[in-house]
Amino acid sequence: MPPTKAEKKPAEKKPAEKAPAEKKPKAEKKISKEGSSDKKKKRTKKSVETYKIYIFKVLKQVHPDIGVSSKAMGIMNSFINDIFEKLAQESSRLARYNKKPTITSREIQTAVRLVLPGELAKHAVSEGTKAVTKFTSS
C-alpha cells in the first residue's frame, strides 16, 4: 500500500505541472490575440437598440413619482418591439396589395388603424399625424 500512495503523489503532481504548462501557451495566444482584439472589439460591438429610455421619459411625464423595475422595463420594451413588428408587417402587406414599392405614411396610418383597437388607434393616428407635420415643417 505505501508504494501506491507514493505513486499517487507523483501522479497528482504531474497533472498539476502540466496544467500550468498548458496555461502558458494559452496566455501566449491571448497576447497574440490582444493585438487583433481591437479589431474584434469593433466587430463584436453591436448597438442594441432599446426603447427603455423613452419608456422611462413617458413614465416620468405621466407619473413622476412612480418607478419601474428592470423586468417590467424589459416587458415594455418587448411589447413595443412586437407592436412595431406588427405595424411593419401590415404596412408591407398593404404596399404589396396596392403594388407600390414604397411604404409611405399612408400605409403606416392604415396599418395602425388595422392593428390597434378602437380609441387607441384614433389617438395613435392623431399623434402620428402631429409628429409627421412637425418633422416636415422643421
From Swiss-Prot:
SUPFAM superfamilies given in the database record: Histone-fold
CDD domains named in the record: HFD_H2B
Region: Disordered, residue numbers: 1-46
GO annotation, cellular component aspect: nucleosome; nucleus
Biased composition (Basic and acidic residues): 1-38
Cross-referenced InterPro entries: Histone-fold, Histone_H2A/H2B/H3, Histone_H2B, HISTONE_H2B_site
SMART domains noted in UniProt: H2B (SM00427)
Record's keyword terms, sorted: Acetylation, Chromosome, DNA-binding, Isopeptide bond, Nucleosome core, Nucleus, Ubl conjugation
Covalent cross-link Glycyl lysine isopeptide (Lys-Gly) (interchain with G-Cter in ubiquitin), where: 134
N6-acetyllysine carried by residues: 8, 29-30
Molecular function in Gene Ontology: DNA binding; protein heterodimerization activity; structural constituent of chromatin
Coiled-coil regions, chain positions: none
UniProt-listed Gene3D superfamilies: Histone, subunit A (1.10.20.10)
The keyword Zinc-finger is annotated on this UniProt entry: no
Subcellular compartments: Nucleus; Chromosome
PTM field: Can be acetylated to form H2BK6ac, H2BK33ac and H2BK34ac. Monoubiquitinated to form H2BK143ub1; may give a specific tag for epigenetic transcriptional activation.
Keyword Electron transport: no
Main location group: nucleus
Function comment: Core component of nucleosome. Nucleosomes wrap and compact DNA into chromatin, limiting DNA accessibility to the cellular machineries which require DNA as a template. Histones thereby play a central role in transcription regulation, DNA repair, DNA replication and chromosomal stability. DNA accessibility is regulated via a complex set of post-translational modifications of histones, also called histone code, and nucleosome remodeling.
Subunit structure and binding partners: The nucleosome is a histone octamer containing two molecules each of H2A, H2B, H3 and H4 assembled in one H3-H4 heterotetramer and two H2A-H2B heterodimers. The octamer wraps approximately 147 bp of DNA.
Sequence similarity: Belongs to the histone H2B family.
Protein name, entry field: Probable histone H2B.3
